[in-house]
Structures are given as structure tokens and as C-alpha cells.
Amino acid sequence: VYILECSDEKSRARNYAIVKAVAILGTLLVPLLRATLMQNVSERWHVVYLVPAIIGFVMALFALLFAKETNVFLTKRIEYLKTPIEEREQRSKEEREQNAQGGILTAVNFAFKHRQLRFLIIACCCFYLASLGTATYSTVMAKSALMTEEEITLALFLYPVGNALFTLISGFVSDKFGRKITIIAMSCSALACYLLFILSGMFKWTPYLTGFAIGGFMGSYWGAGDTIGGIMFSESSPTNLRSSVTVINTLLNGVMGGLATVITMILLPIIPEKMFGYMYLGLTVPGLVGAIVIMWLFVGETRGLDLKTVTGTEWDKPKKN
């Protein structure tokens, strides 16, 4: 939300993608620490993640102390403070009646009453069913592809590169061609990259290609995911509900990811470890296809909208008299 509100309409997705891509390159620390502190001994994995955790905490504290409030929020706040008290009370009463005062329950209620956010939620439900591939690539490399710890470390050196590259691509495509085209293109890219990851690992191609492919999948998948659940949710919500509405996306990710995990728990005992990768590939297809269809048919384009004036009702069909 902060990045989006600090950007103009024409460069919103691009700026979001640039910041995220730079952050992703920071995960090069993981293979570097695997090769140095962990020394490719799997029992020492906790040492690898301790250093990035400390760095992340320090940077979050730095942002908390020194980041300024966004102009979008300040404009709304100043406008409110300049309003006479009587008018504020009347406006507050009207906003309460319209469920527009913030909070997760209010945001959910508001979202299901309005066409755009309602179908974005449905699209996200489909999309996050395919999220298993983002959390299981280490298992696929170790159990299905039978890669050694050294090979996995080499693959992880190219993972952030592929991830950052496809993240950048999604941002530039989104601002140039629109949100819908981005979701379709990056979803197709995610399927292609995951297939390449499986083939490269299973047929013992170079681990660098394996790492780049899974990085490309992650960048493509979350490039589409950020566009659906991050950018489009924000661009389809009024300012006073924007943060709460984006929390819905996070909750959907957890709920649908949990459902996908339950499905795999049922399948894993009856599927050989060698086939895990193919199983995860098969589970990504229905969710991504469903999200593409819903986005294309039922969700309106949001590129170029002014976040200061969005009400969330722009896509509602006129009520019949």
C-alpha cells in the first residue's frame, strides 16, 4: 500500500516491481550462507536464516522510524480536519451506514457487496490453490530430482536472479498493457517455468538452469499474484478501507494454501517421491486457469485509476428501478 500510494497512476506497478526485485536479490544471502556458514550440511539450516532475519528486523525498525506518511493519506486527513464538526459527524454517520470506516470485518462486508472486489476474491481463491509450487521446490529438488546439497546450493544462486527478472517484467507489463494482460501472461509464464524446473531437475540438466527456472516460476506466479491481490485490490478500494481490504488477500492466501496442503496430505502417501514434482505441476494448472477465466470475464481494468478518488463502486451494475 505504501509503495502504491507513493507512485503515480502510470508507474505504480513498475515502482512496486522494482522495489520488490531489489529485495528479492537480497535472498542471494541464502546460497552464500549455505556455502559458507552451513557448508552444505543440512542440519545447520537454521544458521542460514538467522542472519537475514536479523537484517530484516533492523531494516523494518529503520523504516518505522524514518519513513514519511503518504500524500494520499495526508490529503484525505487534512481534508477531514478542515471540515466543520457538524459536517464531519454527518459524513461519519453516512460512512458507517455504507460500511466504509475500516477494519477487516467491515472490509469483507464491503467487498462482497461490490462486484469488482467480490470477483477479485473469487479469482484469488482459485489462484492461491496453485501456491504449493512456491513452497515445495526444495523438496522436489531433494526428493524427486535427487539433487545433492551442493547442486541445490548452485541452483539457489540463480533462483533470485530468475525471480527478480520475472518480477521486473510483470511490473513493466502491468503498467504498459494493463492488469488483466499481466495476470494472463505471468500465469502462463509460471506454468512454463515450473515445467522447465521439473524437466531440468528430473533429467539432470545443469542446476543453474533448474534454479533459474524455479526463480522464474516464483517471479511469474507472485507477479500475477501481486497484480491480483495487491495492486488490483488496492486500486479497487477507497482510501479508508484500502489497508483492510489488502488484508483479505493475505487471509485468502493462508486459507487456500492450507486447503491445498490438505489435498497434498491426502495424495502424498499414495504417490512415489519421484512423482512429487509432477503432482505439484498438476495442482497448479486448475487454479491458474480458473483465475485467468474469472479475471478475463468478470473483473474490470484498474490501470490508471486515481487512488484518491476510487470508491470501489465504479464497476457495480446499475440497479434496476
Language model regions located:
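Glycine-rich segments within core transmembrane alpha-helices of 12-TM secondary carriers
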Residues: 11-39, 55-56, 249-261
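Extracytoplasmic gate region of multi-pass secondary transporters
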Residues: 114-164, 257-261
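C-terminal ends and interior cores of transmembrane alpha-helices
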Residues: 188-204
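Cytoplasmic membrane-interface "Motif A"-like loop-to-helix N-cap segments
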Residues: 176-187
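Hydrophobic core of transmembrane alpha-helices in multi-pass small-molecule transporters
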Residues: 207-224
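Symmetry-related core transmembrane helices of the 12-TM Major Facilitator Superfamily/SLC fold
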Residues: 46-65, 278-296
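Intracellular juxtamembrane helix-capping segments at the cytosolic ends
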Residues: 1-7, 224-237
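Juxtamembrane intracellular "pre-TM" segments in multi-pass secondary transporters
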Residues: 77-118, 317-318
